[in-house]
């Protein structure tokens, strides 16, 4: 299982990586492995400002639909257009081409309250 050091993690298995004033958000390798084959990603919140922990979309696998939770407060500015035709990118490359949204965090310092790779490993292995 992959635990990149350059991202922050949530207990709900999302990750966030800040690049300038925009952050990429996705689900973790552990989450995609537990979910199985992803068949559809729905992000209806593009352009909306949400609070940390609010649902920003859903991921559909063969047997279930799972909510996606925003790691920090901010505006959802873009969804990954590649996922419309290729939702399996989330399974193949969850920290790269399989990112879900780009967002503008309301306060970048909020990322400091999230888990680092070691903290997230402890959650997964608990």
Curated annotation (Swiss-Prot):
Cofactor binding summary note: Binds 1 lipoyl cofactor covalently.
GO (cellular component) term, any one: cytosol
Listed InterPro entries: 2-oxoA_DH_lipoyl-BS, Biotin_lipoyl, GCV_H, GCV_H/Fam206, GCV_H_sub, Single_hybrid_motif
Cofactor(s) this protein requires: (R)-lipoate
Sorted UniProt keywords: Lipoyl
Any single biological process term in GO: glycine decarboxylation via glycine cleavage system
N6-lipoyllysine carried by residues: 63
Record has Phosphoprotein as a keyword: no
Entry superkingdom: Bacteria
Pfam families xref list: GCV_H
Lipoyl-binding domain: residues covered: 22-104
Family: Belongs to the GcvH family.
Subunit details: The glycine cleavage system is composed of four proteins: P, T, L and H.
Functional description taken from the UniProt entry: The glycine cleavage system catalyzes the degradation of glycine. The H protein shuttles the methylamine group of glycine from the P protein to the T protein.
Protein name listed in UniProt: Glycine cleavage system H protein
UniProt gene name: gcvH
